[in-house]
């Protein structure tokens, strides 16, 4: 089973289409070189062909993450390629973050930031494209890459993309080639091994940050949180909190999107939605405890999702939203400390920071605020 993240399949299709365009024979597998690694991986390609009398090419791949419940599983990827004369193929950057020889277009089904219209694509995905396409681009040419995900918009409607300000399709935000199975025992084991390794390093200062999923990782890096302190946790937050305390962590920061962390404020410490949800119920409880009006509490309780409830509240009563999320951040810290002390006596300080649908840090508990302020970061008001 080829368990690779969506960016890998995108790059494989782009590389296959480029090979066809420059006269190479079609191969049903493409070798993909990885950033900062000597080895490469073999990625299956469904088809590839020349278009417009050889002026353009198209290749198709199908994302296979290996996860039955993964939203990207089976997604069809179309990569259109076209070469143009006149580029120096220098390594200079342009505004969208790509070198000047690579003209990247997010086609139908690829997520874009609502605020700017720019494609939602991670640095890993950008680097992967550059590393694998640059050797194939003839000297003096530039390459236009257009990626289309025919089912992308429909698939994205089942995700929390809009909560991050991403619209029109699926994000290309993987930070590594291999899929991490966020709800499996193996993923918990891997996270514990990473945690143990970080805590065993001579330079370890007792501080760690748990980020939740790819969006959390992407934002943590953009905000400049210390990379050597970051662990992407997936869904096994409870056992990892305890493991952090056992391994001598003094200050722990929980950094992520409210859609995951809200569960901690309700005492749910395995956050995969197929195992435990209850987010609307937790949100309703938080609103009640903050003294929000009954009409708004009823609105929350009848919402189809946390995101829909928040969007409605932001329009009708933005002050209520701020009260609810501030309460949530505080409850996350309280419930997390209580969870850890259920298993061992620990003085580990646990802070929480939540970001909003515009990808801004907006809410924090008291400890979370102290920790980000010590890094020179402030909350968006």
Curated annotation (Swiss-Prot):
Its EC number is 2.1.1.195. It comes from the Bacteria. InterPro entries: CbiD, CbiD_sf. It catalyses: Co-precorrin-5B + S-adenosyl-L-methionine = Co-precorrin-6A + S-adenosyl-L-homocysteine. SUPFAM superfamilies: CbiD-like. Pathway: Cofactor biosynthesis; adenosylcobalamin biosynthesis; cob(II)yrinate a,c-diamide from sirohydrochlorin (anaerobic route): step 6/10. Keywords: Cobalamin biosynthesis, Methyltransferase, S-adenosyl-L-methionine, Transferase. It holds the Pfam family CbiD. GO terms for molecular function: cobalt-precorrin-5B C1-methyltransferase activity. One of its GO terms (biological process) is methylation. Belongs to the CbiD family. NCBIfam families: cbiD (TIGR00312). This is Cobalt-precorrin-5B C(1)-methyltransferase. It comes from Prochlorococcus marinus (strain NATL1A). The lineage of its organism: Bacteria, Bacillati, Cyanobacteriota, Cyanophyceae, Synechococcales.
